[in-house]
Amino acid sequence: MVYAHNLGFPRIGIKREMKKTVEAYWRGEISQQQLQQQAIELQLTNWKIQAEAGVDLIPVGDFSWYDHVLDMAVRVGAIPSRFKALNSNITDTMFCMARGQAPNGIETSACEMTKWFDTNYHYIVPEFTTNQSFELHHDDLFKSTKLALENNYRAKPVILGPLSFLWLGKCKGESFNKLLLLEKLLPVYAEIFEQLSSLGVEWVQVDEPILVLDLPPEWQQAFLTTYQQLNFFNLKCLLATYFGSLDDNLSLTCQLPVDGLHIDYCRAPDQLDSVLSQLPAEKILSVGIIDGRNIWCNDLNRSLTLLENIQSSLGDRLWVAPSCSLLHVPIDLDQENKLDVELKSWFAFAKQKVAEAAFLTRGLREGRESIGAELKKNEEVIISRKTSKRIHNPNVEKKAASVTERLMRRQHEHSIRKNKQTAQLNLPLFPTTTIGSFPQTSQIRCLRRDYKQGKIDDALYEEKIRQEIAEVIGIQVKLGLDVLVHGEPERNDMVEYFGELLDGIAITSNGWVQSYGSRCVKPPIIFGDVSRERPMTLRWIEYAQSLTTKSVKGMLTGPVTILAWSFVRDDQPRSQTAKQIALALRDEVQDLERSGVRVIQIDEPAFRECLPLRKAAWQDYLEWAVKCFRLASCGVKDETQIHTHMCYSEFNDIIEAIAALDADVITIESSRSEMEILKSFEKFAYPNDIGPGIYDIHSPRIPRVAEIEELAVRALQYIPIERLWINPDCGLKTRNWEETKEALSRMVDAAKHLRKAFSSEKTPTIDLELQPAST
């Protein structure tokens, strides 16, 4: 029989119960028993939603209090020694690995965090050593599976496959071949399968997303040997791939001794014919035809026609599913009561997407007429979106068509600009700054909420925001920071804020998705041509600058990041949408400069995450991404200093594109990786200024002054003294004021020590084992 199934469901809860519960636990307000009870309730709710929609096989093990990769590391005992020594409680150990701090007060340096493939979800990076051991360590998966079975759900446990798990981890200490760990790891996977089999499970979903990447030959070979060795203990294995095409990994994937294969049709429709021709006759094919990463309604008529053609070849060996886990979309469109009715009809969130998969499955089982009403209603929605006048703006399209190369060049090269900027800004050696946001207290969040709900008027809102800006400026001046920010109290999110002010973009009320841990974001929906009617940030920056003689940065989110962290229209190339956003930002940048703002930051933390997963497609993306940044930033005078910020980036393979952005200063996340990221600059002489993140803002742990100095000295191996900035890793929005003030105070003290040590009149007065880079 054709089955409808799902690869994973959002964890956060319809009302973000996960976030509220886990943060209450971190604060010591609830017990671990209460935490686990909430996990049970959230999972039962998720399973019920899917079962009622018509999903046949329900994913189990997709829930996590922080991250599924972290869960897998803990499950197989890949717990770094620094955590084992501090904590015997497995739940607190997990939180300590993620945050550097556990609810019981234990602190140490957190594990590294990075982006999950090309999504905006973050995972905790497993750490492996040459003497790494593994053992079955956590029974959460078995408890969840048993719970699902006891509640009469047909459970399909989901785990990250052994090769993807190793690939996504990093070697700690000396480098070595991670494949050597398979011999110790596979017996633990076998234990997992044995226990699942003993519970009476029929199918297990093993995720191996790295099969859509460019894999070295030894990793390709490792797939064959690994899956030949794995003992599934009579479980049927569905091997799940997603986010791209199998391409050169297709042949080996079809050879693996598994019972079924899931492919991402939405991201890689061209692979379907090759898959059908190579799939062994006995294997199931799960077609991910519902987009798990975007919010547009599926064209059910078109999808059903495609699936009917596949069914004619495969018969009952066809399964229907979303393209990937629905972790990346909001939970329920029914919770949106303020969206425009026509716009809302074009969308589908997780609850609606599993229903779409079930509709299509019923159509395959029982014939088109069985879902005739759904098909007719869906067809009307598809036509509505295609013909709506709100999609296209002739003025925007005309402006985009008139863009020339000249608009994407600064007046002079950076060396000339730097001299002018140095004269104007009068900055010291090792200038200090922050990335943008400052702590957002409950009072600020309530203020914005009351304003949106009409409970307070414009005048009171303006007064309160100005008070907050004045306080933030005063704190920075007192701390001794060199280039200031206004703190962004008016912004709930760095992308959503601009989404609210740009035409062609819709904002939801409850469209939350998980970014990392308990942090959730509400991505805007880009449904049409994007334009700016009026200045978006000008009044707040002008006010902030009026309070101090020090430079205050104008703060904008870049075109690629707005694109990456939004749900984007799928009826035109993403590059075209990015160009429209860049033009809107260019107008804002020029307005800021005209008002006297001397430093403007255009954040692009998503620049690298948007890279296609296959290198063959990189060049095209990098060309339009660089052009869009330059289009947004190059309309200013030499004296205006352009900053950009990037997170979680490995620069080695795109360093030339980073340089091509031609930002005067780039700040980057680097503290969790202990400045390893700066190795990118060993062979490439990056010409502009750099501010490597000098402490980790994602952890509540406050670094010592000596730690900050040590990281700065490491950075000087790669960055000339006169080009090094001192700053945190990222914005400070998620931290509290006590942590923030103390951490920034220590950062400023470290910068002062460095200036004294490296002043031209004196020999360095701190013990430096590392030699600074030359100019």
Swiss-Prot record:
Residues involved in 5-methyltetrahydropteroyltri-L-glutamate binding: 16-19, 115, 519-520, 565, 609
GO biological process, one term: methionine biosynthetic process
Binding-site residues, Zn(2+): 645, 647, 669, 730
The keyword Translocase is annotated on this UniProt entry: no
CDD domains: CIMS_C_terminal_like, CIMS_N_terminal_like
Residues reported in the UniProt entry to bind L-homocysteine: 435-437, 488, 603
The organism's place on the tree of life at top rank: Bacteria
Active site, renumbered: 698 (proton donor)
Example of a GO MF term: zinc ion binding
Catalytic reactions on record: 5-methyltetrahydropteroyltri-L-glutamate + L-homocysteine = tetrahydropteroyltri-L-glutamate + L-methionine
Record keywords, A-Z: Amino-acid biosynthesis, Metal-binding, Methionine biosynthesis, Methyltransferase, Repeat, Transferase, Zinc
Free-text remark on how the cofactor is bound: Binds 1 zinc ion per subunit.
EC number in record: 2.1.1.14
Described purpose of this protein according to its UniProt entry: Catalyzes the transfer of a methyl group from 5-methyltetrahydrofolate to homocysteine resulting in methionine formation.
NCBIfam families, sorted: met_syn_B12ind, PRK05222.1
Protein name from the UniProt record: 5-methyltetrahydropteroyltriglutamate--homocysteine methyltransferase
Protein's organism: Coxiella burnetii (strain RSA 493 / Nine Mile phase I)
Taxonomic lineage: Bacteria, Pseudomonadati, Pseudomonadota, Gammaproteobacteria, Legionellales
